[in-house]
Amino acid sequence: MKNNDSKISKYISLILRHKPEEIGLKLDEHGYLVVLDLIEGINKSYEGFSMDDLERIVREDSKGRYSFNEDKSKIRANQGHSIKVDLGLEEIKPPKVLYHGTGRKYLESILKNGLIKKERQYIHLSKDRETASIVGKRHGDLVILEVDSESMFNDGIKFYLSKNNVWLCNYVPKKYIKELNLEEVF
């Protein structure tokens, strides 16, 4: 099953973040699916998929997208949901600045309206420019935004930290955003 891991990982991401109904399932209130049900559902498209395959995909996922509960009977995505789930995250004070990588085609709208979560449950922010760069390159011509997270927090905006170290918030008003000059960054 190893040669299909990338495809299956994307499929798992789709199921756990957006469309569990693709395999006839529904996430619980905390975003979990029963592992055996997920494996059975995946087998409808990828015959022979097993618990060993799932554990390997979770373990080898460089972005740390998924986590099991303690006894590995349930699994969920750590963030990125378009479905409302309670991840049990607690408010936490962020570092002074965070970063958001995006494509130049979105810059005008962001500078006018701020960062809006759209179909996602939260805005995703990175603790460093390198991670923001990796994320942003997926959206075309790279732009890295610096977010004054300390001022946001001091002004009452809540921040959360996902299990895989992605900073989350509901909205980033435009006054806290600054475009970085990439020549100075790298």
UniProtKB/Swiss-Prot annotation:
Transmembrane segments: none annotated. Its EC number is 2.7.1.-. GO terms for molecular function: NAD+ poly-ADP-ribosyltransferase activity; tRNA 2'-phosphotransferase activity. It comes from the Bacteria. Keywords: NAD, Transferase. One of its GO terms (biological process) is tRNA splicing, via endonucleolytic cleavage and ligation. The keyword ATP-binding does not apply. The keyword Transmembrane helix does not apply. HAMAP family: KptA. Belongs to the KptA/TPT1 family. Removes the 2'-phosphate from RNA via an intermediate in which the phosphate is ADP-ribosylated by NAD followed by a presumed transesterification to release the RNA and generate ADP-ribose 1''-2''-cyclic phosphate (APPR>P). May function as an ADP-ribosylase. This is Probable RNA 2'-phosphotransferase.
